[in-house]
Amino acid sequence: ESRGLGDVYKRQENKELISNISHDLKTPITAIKGYVEGIMDGVADTPEKMDRYIRTIYNKANEMNLLINELTLYSKIDTNRIPYNFTTISAKGYFGDCAEDLSVELESKGAEFTYRNFMDDDCKVIVDPEQLRRVINNIVSNSLKYTDKPKVEITMDVKDVGDFIQIELGDNGRGIAAKDLPFIFDRFYRADASRNSSKGGSGIGLSIVKKIVEEHGGNIWATSEEGVGTTMYFVIRKYQEVPVNE
């Protein structure tokens, strides 16, 4: 019986995925088609208009590419085929580099970014640098998507919590309703889907984030207040050398 229910849930998940993907691919395709038709009909009759049309087409194609990449990664996650390349690195140096990249990106989008690192210089972690950066970028991307205030504020704090390092990524966005908060890391879940559908997104981004954090031996959770903002927390274990008995 439990297997039967599992199959039902799986089919429901797949239906939701197909519905979300259909919507999210259709939106940029419709825009691309419209702008291409405009060029063909001679509407873009000045260099400025032509430049604007081509840039819009390029941006919409990028949106589609990002979605397809997310789906490919999800497929690998679902079959446990993500290739991890773990390495031992300085926590302060690694998260400092991540913050520097974020700072440049957020500044270009007019967002305010604050970074604080409370780790000792000699603290190390075993991580896959590329996959963990995906976690941070995905969370920040989500924050930008669901923040509708004139001044977007993003914070990143890295803290020492015993055997673990805790990373906190906060925003001043619209927040998540208490009823939705327990489910935001579930596959295909979109809080208040009717409102958020205009923002796109397949609803698999945070499930990917959760999987990567757990594969690092950590866990992830969130706190949120509607109208005030959301903070995502995740912890990963510190690297500790095991003394060798002589």
Annotate each PLM feature.
Residues 143-144:
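Short helix-loop "hinge" at the ATP-lid/N-box region of the Bergerat-fold HATPase_c
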